[in-house]
């Protein structure tokens, strides 16, 4: 892991020491709810746009995958009898809605951005194409990948890992509401211990729930590091990208 960031330096001055040139940021749909119980909190969107804009400002290429849990949760409907594939397709549409909202927030902050969907939605967003996405990233546009993998039975965590591998990102950053991975739920257990670093096999063997099994196996097979961090902490994303110690690193070890 890199040395702690020199906090006396400006982000621009630290850019040469930046650990990551291209990242894939995974945001949960629930993160967009903010203080509400459902939907999208504009204040949260604006704050996220500001933090993402800071990365773009120092030359970091940013891809984003957003979940859809703030708008649609298929588990309850599936339990009530809805077909799983139908529920997954509805969840994919929810991620497109979140992607459009994020694009709007970014563009209001004068940050060029694109939404690409794994399922064709002509006239609404672009259809995902790897080569086109990489061209956008290289030119400085933020690319928001929506509709998951385009297939049912795959989570947005798996989609984030897949897109990160496809676009040759340096790391997948999973934004959560806690500052890393713990041996047990830190909300319920005051003695929960935080891990600074884990291997892929540690996560699988200890069933730590960082991501689903498919996602962890995917990043392990392609040696894609994952860092879990607290997106609600102001400045954490920028500090992490320029080399600061935030959250928990999951890699080959």
Swiss-Prot record:
Cytoplasm in keyword set: yes
The entry's keywords: ATP-binding, Cytoplasm, Kinase, Nucleotide-binding, Pyrimidine biosynthesis, Transferase
EC numbers, comma separated: 2.7.4.22
One Pfam family named in its UniProt record: AA_kinase
Binding residue positions for ATP: 26-29, 69, 73, 176, 182, 185
One cellular component (GO) term of this entry: cytosol
Regulation: Inhibited by UTP.
Single GO biological process annotation from the record: UDP biosynthetic process
Main subcellular localisation: cytoplasm
Binding site for UMP: 68, 88, 149-156
One function term, GO molecular function aspect: UMP kinase activity
Broad EC category: transferase
Family recorded in the similarity comment: Belongs to the UMP kinase family.
HAMAP family reported in the protein's UniProt record: PyrH_B (MF_01220_B)
PANTHER family per UniProt: URIDYLATE KINASE, URIDYLATE KINASE PUMPKIN, CHLOROPLASTIC
NCBIfam families reported for this sequence: pyrH_bact
Function summary: Catalyzes the reversible phosphorylation of UMP to UDP.
UniProt name for this protein: Uridylate kinase
Organism: Chromohalobacter salexigens (strain ATCC BAA-138 / DSM 3043 / CIP 106854 / NCIMB 13768 / 1H11)
Phylogenetic placement of the source organism: Bacteria, Pseudomonadati, Pseudomonadota, Gammaproteobacteria, Oceanospirillales
